[in-house]
């Protein structure tokens, strides 16, 4: 496809941001204004040209379907400044394909992979001064967002859409970084219905998790831990991340239609195979938690968050997975290999990274 760019609004650098005052090594996982974002509108049945904007606000119709009927999808990915001086983004195409799956699920127009990739490259390049230095351990978080902007009062798909990408430098999702965390099983809330939108990355799934997440935090846990919504027997997700368990040289992760297919989890499965592990994707009953030698939550934000224990307060059980409170050897190997690929210090034999030029 023929991709065109145009600049809109005031395109000067964000001069209020003094780069020398950024403490790269102690960044939180949060929003920081950067210089530019990129946008593309879908109108009259086709995608338009890419717009580059320095404004961090959008104008939206009060009857837009994104506001009333949940026509909203997003992705999460990262770019890294590497020791060789290059900037690499991780698995752009896979994020494009997952967004396309979400679009099919909630009846939004699919964004062509080529357009998605070009916009990711453009927004990272425009904001390259905000990509944290390698030694900081931080990264540039990339947030693609697609919303229905067309007005509807009845429950119908919009006829117009806005796709945009903004970026923000971020530190670790959990304060301790690659360190063990405690989780608690929450049965009072479900993240997603069995035949609902759990396998799509839509905002409604995260809104449904807010109350459970607050309960977990108020009780002193890192995050909530979900069982399946239908029977409350099988492991679903760790808050906003996928679960994996390790035992007897096997990497085991849940199989469920209500779980978001994590690109990080898929990467870890491949790396586990590369390390000689067996990989099993299958339903995992809650009781099996007591048999795991290691376990973790995985996703773009956290990468791997090793699990120390999972408490089932309702049944007065505690599944202690890390006896010494430290990440297990397999988790450490997987984390080290994945980070090495992302930072370009290990050969990218699977073609996961894209150098931003």
List each model region and its residues.
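Helix-start/capping segments and mature chain N-termini
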Residues: 2-123, 145, 152-357
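Extended, Lys/Arg-enriched charged tracts that mediate electrostatic binding to polyanionic substrates
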Residues: 132-147
């Amino acid at each position: 496809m023929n991709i065109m760019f145009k600049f809109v609004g005031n395109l000067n650098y964000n001069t209020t941001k003094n780069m020398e005052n950024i403490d790269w090594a102690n960044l939180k996982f949060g929003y920081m204004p950067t210089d530019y974002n990129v946008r593309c509108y879908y109108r009259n049945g086709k995608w338009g040209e890419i717009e580059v904007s320095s404004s961090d606000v959008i104008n939206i119709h009060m009857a837009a379907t994104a506001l009333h009927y949940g026509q909203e999808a997003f992705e999460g990915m990262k770019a890294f400044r590497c020791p060789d001086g290059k900037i690499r983004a991780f698995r752009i195409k896979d994020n494009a394909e997952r967004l396309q799956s979400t679009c099919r699920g909630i009846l939004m127009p699919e964004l062509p992979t080529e357009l998605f990739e070009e916009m990711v490259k453009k927004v990272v390049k425009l904001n390259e001064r905000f990509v944290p230095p390698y030694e900081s351990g931080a990264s540039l978080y990339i947030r693609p967002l697609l919303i229905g902007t067309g007005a509807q009062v009845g429950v119908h798909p919009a006829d117009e859409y806005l796709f945009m990408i903004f970026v923000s430098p971020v530190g670790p999702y959990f304060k301790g970084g690659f360190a063990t965390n405690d989780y608690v099983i929450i049965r009072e809330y479900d993240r997603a219905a069995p035949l609902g939108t759990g396998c799509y990355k839509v905002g409604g799934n995260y809104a449904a998790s807010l109350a459970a997440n607050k309960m977990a935090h108020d009780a002193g846990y890192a995050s909530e831990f979900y069982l399946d919504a239908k029977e409350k027997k099988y492991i679903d997700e760790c808050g906003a991340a996928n679960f994996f368990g390790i035992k007897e040289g096997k990497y085991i992760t849940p199989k469920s239609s209500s779980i978001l297919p994590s690109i990080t989890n898929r990467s870890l499965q491949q790396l586990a195979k590369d390390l000689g592990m067996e990989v099993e994707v299958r339903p995992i009953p809650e009781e099996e938690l007591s048999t795991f030698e290691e376990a973790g939550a995985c996703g773009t934000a956290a990468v791997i968050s090793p699990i120390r224990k999972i408490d089932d307060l309702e049944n007065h059980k505690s599944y202690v997975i890390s006896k010494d409170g430290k990440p297990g050897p397999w988790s450490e190997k997987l984390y080290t290999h994945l980070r090495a690929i992302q930072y370009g210090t290990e050969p990218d034999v699977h073609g996961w990274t894209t150098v931003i030029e």
